[in-house]
């Protein structure tokens, strides 16, 4: 037998037992007559002692080095009282080695487990990076999460049904990864960005509660929390309203947090998209941050200051204030840095006012814009934002979107810089009632979620007449500023679906070409249905306390969508391309 116990599982209850362990040398210490090693496996670390009492094992241990793969047979004994290590789960015991077997020696590692290695090194030698206890723990947590989700879904009547990986390219927002067909030359499959249409078709097939833990693919620009291939917990239901879907999914996430890290998330508040954008400048607000935006356009619309009065009198403008309690200590240099920061989001500047004495009116205000205000305006501003002595007010004034984006980003930065964001808290919420459509860079209407989301209380005729007023029956789950899941009630009326396609500029010929199968299916007694998808990678990232999604994926890609370990993507044999009727055009 190669193993009777895992290293990290040993404790006082095992004292006196003979055990067989298999794993790696984590650290070695030679004390002359005795040799100690920390032995590691996926479950943890235990100290092993080589004693002259078992001379053969001691002699063999002299040749051990870090990362040798070994087997130990020995007895679990109690550590002397003065050698107990309370920082180790196994710190009360050690294993007295009777036999040592070396499965494999190890070359000197290209990584140093005791130092910070570069991201490039870690990804190139990922199989070594995953030996680190913190990395192993993250993947164990991920496995625990998926196991919990499957149990929850099974207990609530959901069926685990697989959907195709090779499918048809359909416009879902990002670029598709295309797969050429050898049999149908000149034609391509697409790897799914999500199982969206297939799970809707499953509802039409009568499977009223579906789920799947599934790989999805998007060829898009990457960030720290994005990967070209990622894993979704995909869910769809029939005959449930949006609040009913949210209740089930909230219960799952609530219980997942309790099961995984012992945290009770409580009841999730519900907030409309409009409120989230107005107060926090984001559709995924981090409620751990106490700072909020307050609209003041009505107060400053008549001041002799074009920076304020022009957006204040523009229906598409916005003037908003963030009050920072006790922020008057912020230096001019810091203010200049914040001014540069909001410029990233298109803001032309950042007005500010320090409240040195709230009872002194404008005399108690230190600000380059004080000369444009009068006592009445200042009093109204101070009351609106509840200004106090020692505060600083930051003003954003521009187009609605620019002000909202810039001040929302500033809010987050101020919360971090000033230690206002309560990092030890969990703050979940639902964001609902998103706009049905938004304008793209060319000014055309685009679906804010996807083109299969149903509007709220709109007929097809009303939607076509006034699409920009429509509210989507959509919902996102947000935790600590991260969107962890999003979904909607789906369109189940063929007339409504065709109307949405037309609004998005998809004519009837394109509708038949791209979505003919869906439009046909909608004609045959389609049930009302709604669903949601969670990002498993992002959930795991939050539950393990890391800020990089690559830390919770066994073999992730870089931000350039490359695998440094296998050197994918790579060139392929010209003969393979010829069989696919593909010729590669070299970039100039």
Curated annotation (Swiss-Prot):
Entry GO terms, CC: cytoplasm
Pfam families tied to this protein: GAD, tRNA-synt_2, tRNA_anti-codon
Enzyme class: ligase
Keywords: Aminoacyl-tRNA synthetase, ATP-binding, Cytoplasm, Ligase, Nucleotide-binding, Protein biosynthesis
Region (Aspartate): 196-199
Binding site for L-aspartate: 172, 218, 449, 490
CDD domains, per database record: AspRS_core, EcAspRS_like_N
EC code: 6.1.1.12
Gene Ontology molecular function: aspartate-tRNA ligase activity; ATP binding; nucleic acid binding
Catalytic activity line of the entry: tRNA(Asp) + L-aspartate + ATP = L-aspartyl-tRNA(Asp) + AMP + diphosphate
Alphabetized InterPro entries for the sequence: Aa-tRNA-synt_II, aa-tRNA-synth_II, aa-tRNA-synth_II/BPL/LPL, Asp-tRNA-ligase_1, Asp-tRNA-ligase_1_N, Asp/Asn-tRNA-synth_IIb, AspRS_core, GAD-like_sf
Subcellular location(s) of the protein: Cytoplasm
Any GO BP: aspartyl-tRNA aminoacylation
Transmembrane segments: none
Residues engaged in binding ATP: 218-220, 227, 483, 535-538
HAMAP family: Asp_tRNA_synth_type1
Record's subunit section: Homodimer.
Family designation: Belongs to the class-II aminoacyl-tRNA synthetase family. Type 1 subfamily.
Function in brief: Catalyzes the attachment of L-aspartate to tRNA(Asp) in a two-step reaction: L-aspartate is first activated by ATP to form Asp-AMP and then transferred to the acceptor end of tRNA(Asp).
Designated name of the protein: Aspartate--tRNA ligase
Naturally occurring in which organism (per UniProt): Haemophilus influenzae (strain 86-028NP)
Gene that encodes it: aspS
